[in-house]
From Swiss-Prot:
Organism: Rhizobium etli (strain ATCC 51251 / DSM 11541 / JCM 21823 / NBRC 15573 / CFN 42)
Keywords linked to the UniProt accession: Periplasm, Plasmid, Signal, Sugar transport, Transport
GO cellular component terms listed in the entry, alphabetical order: periplasmic space
Protein function: Part of an ABC transporter complex involved in D-apiose import. Binds D-apiose, D-ribose and D-ribulose.
Protein name: D-apiose import binding protein
Amino acid sequence: MKLTRRLTLAAFASALALGTAMPAFAADLIAIITPAHDNPFFKAEAVGAEAKAKELGYETLVMTHDDDANKQSEMIDTAIGRGAKAIILDNAGADASVAAVKKAKDAGIPSFLIDREINATGVAVAQIVSNNYQGAQLGAQEFVKLMGEKGNYVELVGKESDTNAGIRSQGYHDVIDDYPEMKSVAKQSANWSQTEAYSKMETILQANPDIKGVISGNDTMAMGAIAALQAAGRKDVIVVGFDGSNDVRDSIKSGGIKATVLQPAYAQAQLAVEQADAYIKNKTTPKEEKQLMDCVLINADNAGKLETFALTN
């Protein structure tokens, strides 16, 4: 038995010396999973989360699921396999993501959701999201003002599987529908995509040449819409977005898009990491699982202070 123990210890020491034979579990790894980074909002989330995690002494594993629930599930498996201490997740669907978050919980890994909620409570430790309804009302109020309280308009909606798309649309309509001379002539989903928004806007414009405004569920679609309008020589159409991206900031400053609504992507992601750190070190949980962060209207008056989804002093 002593010989066996000596051999076992020798093998263990040899494996450590080689640095290749032992499983690679990171004692201080935080996994950060978001949609694709070609959308600057999601990139800002990842950058903010990674910066805060490294500041607090963690290693990071950054992955993108491209709004594919199956791919997201595989990434949760990767995080589990790597022994992550926490997962920061902007999920791939309110219903489709519940099982993946539960899988992480069952493996002893807490999840901290940002931007998008899931249709379940008690599965994630935290769900930190923008106050999308409040933000949408801000955007709609500015849109109505810019439209002079009348005229035909178009609404571009996000992914149907994303609860934010519906919440923002409801917030828009709860304001706009109070103005009887504001008339919706088209409402279509462009799935948060700039390319789809460009194509949809071209088609809508052909059928409705008399439109006066476009209100968009996010900035990426707003950028697609303004590009299509400008290509058609329609610089008179009012476009309002939602997110607070640098691209839209620049468009506002140059007289293109008229307004957007800032949701604090960077700060939201950093708060999630801070809460994950408190949980990892002390098992401290936030007072509320679902937490709302208010949005801010961005227009020509304050666009110059906007940088990477945050207002500077």
